[in-house]
């Protein structure tokens, strides 16, 4: 990969207020304030190793939505060749998505079936869900703001993608990505 190529990891997730990913011990019975209203945000994100990461919200996860996410990512990383690692969700394989990618200097690299753990962005989703679970979410806007703030903070950490780069890229490309 050249310096003109940006490596990214795409995935979608729907953090919601009713998920319980937060655990705690309490001997004094600390009161827990929890919002029981179900609010969810269908979130798409691309974690960029050496470019600009994005997170956006869509109503659905259809092929048109995936194309729009790719379009937004291309705008965030103009005049770059994009390599995007993604899972085998049916909308990711749609002709509309593949045609858009082919016409805009985007290479889609699909993970093997049933291997979501190979996508480093999954760990970011786990951390975001934990944060949402521990936060009293007032409304849709508060949920989306919480997700964006967490994603922006977490996307800047190399620990999410560093091992993937070392394990799956050739050494000369890995050293370029890691700035060595």
Q: In which residue ranges do the predicted regions lie?
A:
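Generic beta-sheet signal
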Residues: 5-8, 80-86
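Extended, low-complexity cationic-aromatic segments
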Residues: 1-71, 171, 175-180
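Short, conserved catalytic/metal-binding motifs centered on acidic residues
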Residues: 10-14, 45-47, 86-88, 119-122, ...
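RNase H-like polynucleotidyl transferase catalytic core
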Residues: 30-37, 103-120, 137
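A structural signal for short coil/turn segments at secondary-structure junctions
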Residues: 2-3, 77-78, 104
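C-terminal anion-handling pockets and recognition modules
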Residues: 3-7, 121-180
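A short acidic, amphipathic alpha-helical/loop segment
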Residues: 69-72, 96-100
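Acidic, metal-coordinating catalytic cores used for nucleic-acid/nucleotide bond scission
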Residues: 16, 84-98, 113-118
